[in-house]
Amino acid sequence: MIGFGLHLELVALLRATRGGLHPDLLAAAHAAHLGGADHVVVPVRADRRRADERDARHLQESGVLPVHLEIAPTTENVAFATQLRPAGVVLVPEPAGDRPAGRGLDVASEAARITEAAGALADAGILVAISTDPDEAQLVAANGAGALAVELHAGRYAAAASEDARVHEFLALSRSAASARALGLRVHVGHGLDYGNVTRVAALPDVEVVRGGHAVIARAMFTGLHQAVAAMRERLVRAAAEEAPIP
């Protein structure tokens, strides 16, 4: 069955706007669990302005849901991850500002650094995923760097301004998912997915996990997080049960 991971960045961002303890990331994880999420994604950025090591430890120790860290492949981040030993780590570019990076890692040009990070994480028994654009060369580089999974960056698909452009980007995701599986990599997809555009992605037979945050948290403002996660989960399961994705 296709998995869903709830990205907690917007929950942490809302907390950071006023400081203090609310909204509580652990309460969000409990609601996500009730809604059927399989894990939560905790982004730990260089500035630690949103989520930080304390949040990750708190969530990990709670055991409510498996924790996947989202980090840049720096020495400091890798050292923390190997000490925490979450269920998984997604290696991503460090954002330049407040917005998430609009692309995956350029694994081909940063192979040495990423390979070192992936090796240390794998040695600690952590599932290592590398965020990449849907590009054959990047997939080959991620495989060579020691990734066990790739998280295909769906940003261009999600931001497509026309249906023709959307189909073009979807086909790129589809080809990349198949190529990644042929390389022996597990396939995750994330970034920019909402309740509408996720159905094509979830119907791809090679996709094992979908991750999302913004659309789910936005809906949660009106329905509650439990119900918002459940609605996304239902959408994924229904789409994955279809025989073939709509091109």
Please name every model-derived segment.
Residues 74-85, 135-145, 189, 193-207:
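Catalytic cores of alpha/beta
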Residues 4-25, 66-73, 100-108, 122-134, ...:
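Active-site mouth loops of central-metabolism enzymes
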Residues 127-183:
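Histidine/lysine/aspartate-rich catalytic loop segments that bind and position anionic ligands
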Residues 36-38, 62-65, 83-89, 123, ...:
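Glycine-enriched alpha-helix->loop->beta-strand junction motifs that scaffold or abut catalytic
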Residues 1-86, 141-143, 168:
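Conserved N-terminal beta1-alpha1 strand-loop-helix module at the mouth
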Residues 2-8, 40-42, 67-71, 89-91, ...:
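Hydrophobic faces of well-ordered beta-strands that scaffold small-molecule active sites
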Residues 60, 103, 162, 166, ...:
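C-terminal helical cap(s) of enzyme catalytic domains, especially alpha/beta-barrels
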Residues 90-98, 148-161, 205-225:
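Glycine-rich phosphate-binding active-site loops on the catalytic face of alpha/beta enzymes
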